[in-house]
């Protein structure tokens, strides 16, 4: 049986100062294997598999954010016993001593799992910004469990003029691969993706201006613990307001009574609850 999310969207079209109600059904397929990008004006922009990539590199010239497919099972750890000179010290037993898994932010696209250890200033978590040549130089090693469950060691070596340079290998050092991704070639997208097991760059998003929200799996804190949920994240610059305790959500149009936020998980996952099957909150709506 397919897992489907049926949503009712009330869209604010500022160009014509009117409210339009639309009924749309989004399918993420059995096991929530897909991701859907949705435009309030044009409907579903893209529906694609979400279980075939590991890394997502920001294409923004002023961002160094790198995210992982944590909602679908990718795991990331810093190698805490040494710096980049310790590449050859990592081996097949290293996963047994790993601590503190890292996750993407679910409130800001600009803060990925690889950015977790940043200390502020010119430290970006996975690397340090060089004021003289404007390069970001990788100063950390990582261990990553791919979407297919394979462990790799990874060094994000640098970002230079919009190009990410990195290498990865099996934990025993075999099958070492060096890769370059020129993110500026995909500037009209939010991220450019990469599969570690297949060693391929993946252009899988619609153009950034062509979607407003995405239905996907991601990690969030549930009762203080990181947990994979299925929910809705909004695009950069999209403002969302939540209205609760509404007796007739389909007919409710007073968006001015609510605060709009650009936090990407404003819609999030908690508009539904599990009661043997998922039940949508009948007294909540959102304005986008």
Outline where the language-model segments fall:
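Bacterial Sec-dependent N-terminal signal peptides
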Residues: 1-25
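Surface-exposed, beta-sheet-biased, low-hydrophobicity segments with strongly acidic/polar composition
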Residues: 22-288
């Amino acid at each position: 049986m397919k897992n489907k999310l049926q949503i009712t969207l009330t869209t604010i079209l500022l160009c014509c100062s009117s409210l339009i109600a639309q009924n749309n059904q989004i399918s993420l397929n059995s096991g929530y294997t897909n991701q859907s990008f949705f435009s309030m004006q044009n409907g579903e922009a893209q529906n694609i598999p979400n279980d075939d990539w590991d890394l997502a590199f920001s294409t923004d010239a002023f961002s160094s954010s790198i995210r992982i497919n944590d909602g679908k099972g990718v795991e990331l750890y810093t190698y805490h016993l040494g710096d980049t000179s310790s590449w050859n010290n990592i081996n097949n037993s290293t996963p047994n001593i790993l601590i503190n898994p890292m996750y993407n932010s679910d409130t800001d696209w600009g803060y990925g799992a690889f950015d977790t250890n940043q200390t502020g200033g010119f430290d970006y978590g996975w690397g340090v910004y060089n004021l003289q040549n404007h390069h970001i130089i990788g100063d950390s090693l990582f261990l990553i469990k791919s979407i297919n469950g394979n462990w790799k060691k990874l060094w994000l070596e640098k970002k230079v003029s919009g190009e990410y340079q990195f290498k990865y290998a099996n934990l025993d050092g075999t099958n070492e691969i060096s890769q370059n991704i020129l993110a500026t070639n995909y500037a009209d997208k939010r991220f450019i993706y990469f599969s570690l097991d297949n060693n391929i760059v993946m252009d899988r998003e619609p153009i950034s201006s062509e979607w407003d929200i995405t239905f996907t799996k991601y990690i969030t804190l549930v009762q203080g613990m990181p947990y994979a949920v299925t929910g809705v994240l909004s695009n950069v610059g999209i403002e969302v307001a939540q209205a609760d305790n509404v007796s007739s959500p389909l007919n409710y149009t007073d968006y001015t009574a609510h605060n709009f936020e650009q936090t990407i998980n404003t819609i999030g996952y908690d508009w539904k609850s599990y009661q043997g099957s998922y039940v949508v909150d009948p007294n909540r709506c959102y304005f986008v």
